[in-house]
Amino acid sequence: MSLRTKFFAMTYDRQIAGAEKAGLRAFRERLLAGASGDVIEIGGGTGLNLSCYGPAVRSLTITEPQPPMLRRLERAVHEHRPDAKVLRAPAEDLPFEDDSFDVAVSTLVLCGVDDQPRALRELRRVLRPGGRLLFIEHLRSGDPATARLQDRLNWLNRLVVCCDCNRPTLDSIRAAGFTVTQVEHIELPKAPPFVRPAILGSATVPAAAPRAPQDGARPTAAPPPAARPAG
């Protein structure tokens, strides 16, 4: 575990506080108002989404790969959502059976995973047919000048907030086999110009559609949301 990872976890809430007050919190609330049933959230971070989930959520499972973030997430869950289940797991290798969840949530996470296409395939795998992916994510700008700026300064963004702001995330969602049903191009408040482009939206897993190939076979099971045994 790097000092940078520890520092990022310690300072994340302070870094993002201005953006939350200026509109990011409202984006989260609007997105998660539609969450229902068995929900999985990847990259739960410090738990900023917890209080946005409503009574329609039957079960909430949150994954987080980084121990410093995980400790803060566990404290937030205890305070805001004690019925939620928290696990340490990367988005690229979710420890759940196929078809375990009704809704998956990713907010400012797909920009920071090591392998975005694999993470999206995993989300599609654990969602039931007709399941939904709800997302707020950074996006490579459609404006050529801004996109060039994103490419030029992405190293700085990775250094400060551990993410790539120039990924073609919407294309990646579609490539993973999701059908994008709603997308809104937004600007992240209080962010530098090259980090502002983002999307808020939802995508669905086609009912009874063939699955995208995975790197290893996993058994299929209907009951939700059961963790795969270790080993």
Question: Language-model features: where?
Answer:
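Short alpha-helix
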Residues: 162-177
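A short SAM/SAH-binding and catalytic strip from SAM-dependent methyltransferases
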Residues: 102-115
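Core SAM-dependent methyltransferase catalytic element
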Residues: 185-215, 219-221, 228-231
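Class I SAM-dependent methyltransferase SAM/SAH-binding core
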Residues: 40-93
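A short acidic, Gly/Pro-enriched loop at the edge of an enzyme's catalytic core
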Residues: 92-104
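Conserved beta-strand signature within the Rossmann-like core of class I S-adenosyl-L-methionine
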Residues: 130-138
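A short glycine-rich, Lys/Arg-flanked "PGG" loop and its adjoining helix->strand segment in the class I
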Residues: 117-129
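Conserved class I S-adenosyl-L-methionine
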Residues: 1-37, 48-52, 69-72, 149-151
